[in-house]
Design a protein with these regions (language model features):
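Short helix-capping/linker segments at secondary-structure and domain boundaries
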Residues: 42-45, 81-85, 132-140, 169-184
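Conserved acidic
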Residues: 27-30, 34, 118, 156-160
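A residue-level signal for conserved active-site and pocket-lining positions in enzyme catalytic cores
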Residues: 38, 126, 168
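Glycine-rich, often acidic, oxyanion-interacting loops/wings at catalytic, nucleic-acid
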Residues: 1-59, 189-191
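Phosphate-backbone recognition surface of nucleic-acid-processing proteins
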Residues: 61-64, 70-157
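Low-complexity, acidic/Ser/Thr- and charged residue-rich accessory regions of DNA metabolism proteins
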Residues: 107-108, 144-199
């Protein structure tokens, strides 16, 4: 009874009648104005991000990697901080909570999984950038395919994405720490192919 009556009253207020067209146009105009205001805010935030990213030595070189954008670089740098405080990329993996742990008890050897003890936002940034990179970046697609098809210990979907993300951490670390340019061929050569290992 009462709920149905309330629903009918709300439907009547939102229905497009004689005045409905005017209300709909006004609502659409307000939504467009709000959208334009958000675009301007986004441009301002992006400009500040860009200014801050350029202050970090060699950060601009990370943007030469296909699929890595300003937001990814800014997010990575804000979570990791000064790269000089790390002695190896494994420390960044640990910071992200991407080091492997084995779930076992007694004589039983369980599945390995990531610890998730580190920074959740850093893990999220890496995971979000890896999905499109695996699709659109040829060398990272090869890295992913290697992890899923290698003869010894092939990884499944999410595990392979995490392993490729760890590879991206190593690339970021090397570029930021040593100031080298990104080299897709070097990344490809780092993949130990099953055929060459068997030969």
């Amino acid at each position: 009874g009462m709920k149905r009556a309330q629903t009918l009253v709300e439907a009547a207020q939102n229905s497009i009648g004689l005045d409905g067209g005017i209300c709909a146009r006004m609502e659409m105009q307000l939504l467009l104005e709000d959208y334009r205001a958000k675009e301007i805010q986004l441009e301002k935030v992006t400009a500040v991000l860009e200014t801050e990213v350029w202050k970090v030595p060699h950060a601009e070189k990370l943007l030469s990697i296909k699929g890595v954008g300003l937001v990814t670089v800014a997010g990575f740098l804000s979570e990791v901080g000064d790269i000089r405080r790390f002695n190896s990329p494994k420390q960044i993996q640990k910071l992200a909570g991407l080091e492997l742990k084995e779930n076992s008890s007694g004589k039983h050897r369980g599945r390995t999984s990531i610890s998730k003890r580190g920074r959740k936002r850093l893990r999220k940034i890496l995971f979000q950038v890896m999905l499109p990179m695996i699709q659109n970046n040829a060398e990272f697609r090869e890295v992913y395919e290697y992890f899923t098809t290698r003869q010894k210990n092939p990884l499944k979907g999410k595990q392979a994405i995490i392993a490729a993300g760890c590879k991206l951490i190593r690339v970021f670390y090397t570029i930021l720490k040593h100031g080298v340019d990104y080299d897709p061929q070097k990344l490809r050569m780092d993949i130990i192919r099953p055929e060459s290992a068997a030969a």
